[in-house]
Amino acid sequence: MPEDKVEAIEHVESSRHDATVNEKAIADFLNAEKEMTTWQAVRAHRRLLLFAAYRVTHLAILPFVCASNYGYDTVSNGSSIAMPAFIMSFGAMNHATGSMYLPSIWTSLWTSMTNLGQALGSLIAGFLAERIGRRWTAVSLAILSIVGTFILVFSSTRGMLLVGKTMNGAVVGGLMAIGTTYAADVAPIKLRGALLQAIVFFGVAMQGVSLGIVRAFILDMRPLAWKIVFGIQWAFATLVLIAAFLVPESPVFYVAHGKHDKAQSALRRLHGSSDQYLHIRYGAIVHALDEERKQQSESVSWAELFKGCNLKRTITIGFIMFSTSAIGVPFLTQNIYFLITVGLNVTSVFDIGIGGFFLGCLFVMLGWLSNEGIGRRRLWLWGLIGNFLCMVTIGALGFSTTKASQLAIAVIMNVLISYGVYATVGVAWTICPEISSHRLRQYSQSVAFIVGAVGGWLFNFITPYMYNVDSGNLGAKTGFVYAGLTVVVAVISWFLVPETAGLSVEDIDRAYEMGTAPRHFKSAKATVSAESGH
């Protein structure tokens, strides 16, 4: 049985009629691919997954470099404000205590404008990617990153720093929209989840590296310390440029623009397989886009996201991305500053945080082995349950002021970050590209990151007002607020979030068009397959 499935993928026969593929051949191909286990898919697509091979760079390097850029920027942007050298350069003097501090208005602006920059970058990336392609959009963003990083490194005023942070925020928002779209475009069904999870892995790994670099310079009082932290982003911009010139353009983009010869050439570079296999996969893309066009107008526009069954898809994607902030991710990402305010030693806080990020990498690798079996929807709901329990525990520990309680809060917050990478944030980054239709995927992903960035801006802005002593003064009891919001998200998710694991684009399209309840997507697909004889 396993050998038969692999053979079906590697040597499936095509029915050629003037370079066309009939629907039965496509259906047989997709069903053979969906029925494979993850290990069988790895064997069948081993060229894509051998990292030392030239062809795998085509599939993986662009999304992974985009994720690495995102991971490094998000943490360096937030944790650098805790560096004494940074505070000495951009802080103000508290004459009553004789100490330096960062004015609240500027810390809020740096955080919020970075998030809004991400939203703007996602919007622009969606517009450009549908006109000039995924690759050239990535090149444009990399050039913008070089300029933005230059402004950061040579900033002499808070306003100049704000401009640089906003520009780089736009870069990372756009790159993540491009990276996830590209991965979803080119990945085989059974490897789609693993590759999207790998994007999460690279992002989390770079967050840990970023925190480690900040930790290495935390006691360095020279301005050069924070300049180095920001300047490293030049390396990531260069990697994006290299990756963009190594990879082929998305074959989905080429087919959507009628460039069929280029689409087949891109598929050959990506998969390097037999003519029969490439002909079937090319036919599957053409068929999927044709079916979507039958339901919609020929031209692709932002307005289509809010029409018919696409509206429910857009609402679902936006809800999932917004929820990652609503359940407390901003509270967790501010844990370094928060834990310092409750009395923990600054180096201890950084060390625990670094350990937490690399624990997150282990959780992501666990996801590679288990996500297809567990399913996206079930894992998302489990993640919300775990988030609720941890937030309640953090809130309860807020009633104690002992050192042991403070350490327990630090450990739980970092474990929850790692668990969230696996079960909530990781699932969000995986499922949102899958919910999108082929034609609207880039637009959908841009909307996803716009909504996610707005949610991040909102909760990053209000969270300090919850726990700071000069406002809400909740301290760790802020966990109760996010526990309550998690319950709300879980209830809505039960009715709105679908299961997409193992489903093709056609399966998901059909489920939305038929008005199938999201929680029944998997069973509805099985029923349709049984009735059609596949």
From Swiss-Prot:
One of its GO terms (cellular component) is membrane. GO terms for molecular function: carbohydrate:proton symporter activity. It is a multi-pass membrane protein. One of its GO terms (biological process) is fumiquinazoline C biosynthetic process. It is found in: Cytoplasmic vesicle membrane. The keyword Transmembrane applies. The keyword GTP-binding does not apply. Pfam families: Sugar_tr. Gene3D superfamilies: MFS general substrate transporter like domains. Keywords: Cytoplasmic vesicle, Membrane, Transmembrane, Transmembrane helix. The chain crosses the membrane at residues 48-68, 109-129, 136-156, 169-189, 194-214, 228-248, 326-346, 349-369, 379-399, 407-427, 447-467, 478-498. It comes from the Eukaryota. Disruption phenotype: Seems not to affect fumiquinazolines production. Induction: Expression is positively regulated by brlA, a conidiation-specific transcription factor involved in the early stage of asexual development and necessary for conidiophore formation. Belongs to the major facilitator superfamily. Sugar transporter (TC 2.A.1.1) family. MFS transporter; part of the gene cluster that mediates the biosynthesis of the antitumor cytotoxic peptidyl alkaloids fumiquinazolines that confer a dual-usage capability to defend against phagocytes in the environment and animal hosts. Probably involved in fumiquinazolines metabolism and transport. This is MFS transporter fmqE.
